[in-house]
């Protein structure tokens, strides 16, 4: 099979540059395009050079339609508005769309779901192997423990992150809720402040910390009577997300239309 030709959306950002490096060093994939916002000062620059690699000949562009003429997929770690704009073009072109963008709303998710009858989409709040294994563990632990164990999720990221809770924290919250057989939306508690009253049994709490250059720390706490279980993942480099996203793209190339998660990619969906 020929190399998978991938477009990197948000190519000038930190994740975009990590993706360019990951694709360049992985057999079976090539950078076919580098997408940036129309207002970016980086348009026209070489994608390889921006990623700290030798020049690749691929220039940053704001025209996804033109970039996608001969591409097989797009890997998208941008912002919700950009991702939703990319969804229709990716579906129309028949490209695999790997979405790692966080901060998506319910209406954004509905737009993404609307194309999956004809498009192959992999969407996850976190693309790393470790976090997705953690989510599987969280689901199993939540299934095993009753409401006597309170669930709290604590996450910390660098000071430039613009959304909270993180997509990973929400992924872990969904895993905990699934383990308990409930809907996260009905039990999620965020941003406690002031006199909140006693904690209700069954709540799933979130606390978000921001500061420094932290790539991503997540801890799921199961606090019971006189004992506490803590499950933690610490990301030390964005390359774990880049390699996970690339693995998802290569896997999705052989799948039919549908909406998939990293649990599907890693064979964890039945855990």
Swiss-Prot record:
Keyword Metal-binding attributed: no
Record keywords, A-Z: Amino-acid biosynthesis, Cytoplasm, Diaminopimelate biosynthesis, Lysine biosynthesis, NAD, NADP, Oxidoreductase
Cited Pfam families: DapB_C, DapB_N
Binding site for NAD(+): 10-15, 36, 100-102, 124-127
Positions with a binding annotation for (S)-2,3,4,5-tetrahydrodipicolinate: 158, 167-168
Catalytic residues in the record: 157, 161
Stored HAMAP family: DapB (MF_00102)
Name of the protein this chain belongs to: 4-hydroxy-tetrahydrodipicolinate reductase
Classification of source organism: Bacteria, Pseudomonadati, Pseudomonadota, Alphaproteobacteria, Hyphomicrobiales
């Amino acid at each position: 099979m020929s190399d998978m030709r991938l477009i990197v959306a948000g190519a000038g950002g930190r994740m975009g540059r990590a993706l360019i490096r990951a694709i360049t060093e992985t057999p079976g994939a090539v950078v076919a395009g580098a997408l940036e916002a129309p207002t970016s000062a980086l348009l026209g620059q070489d994608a390889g050079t921006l990623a700290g690699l030798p020049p690749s000949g691929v220039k940053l562009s704001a025209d996804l339609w033109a970039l996608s003429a001969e591409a097989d997929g797009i890997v998208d770690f941008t912002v919700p508005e950009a991702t939703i704009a990319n969804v229709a073009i990716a579906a129309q072109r028949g490209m695999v769309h790997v979405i790692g963008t966080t901060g998506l709303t319910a209406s954004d998710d509905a737009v993404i779901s609307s194309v999956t009858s004809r498009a192959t989409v992999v969407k996850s709040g976190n693309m790393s192997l470790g976090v997705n294994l953690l989510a599987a563990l969280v689901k199993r632990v939540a299934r095993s423990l009753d409401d006597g164990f309170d669930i709290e999720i604590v996450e910390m990221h660098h000071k430039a992150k613009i959304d909270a809770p993180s997509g990973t924290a929400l992924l872990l919250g969904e895993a905990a809720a699934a383990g308990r057989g409930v809907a996260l939306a009905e039990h999620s508690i965020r941003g406690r402040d002031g006199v909140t009253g006693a904690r209700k049994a069954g709540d799933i709490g979130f606390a978000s910390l921001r500061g420094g250059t932290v790539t991503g720390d997540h801890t799921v706490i199961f606090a019971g009577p006189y004992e506490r279980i803590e499950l933690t993942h610490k990301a030390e480099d964005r390359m774990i997300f880049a390699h996970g996203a690339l693995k998802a793209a290569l896997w999705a190339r052989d799948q039919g239309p549908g909406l998939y998660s990293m649990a599907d990619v890693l064979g964890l969906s039945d855990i």
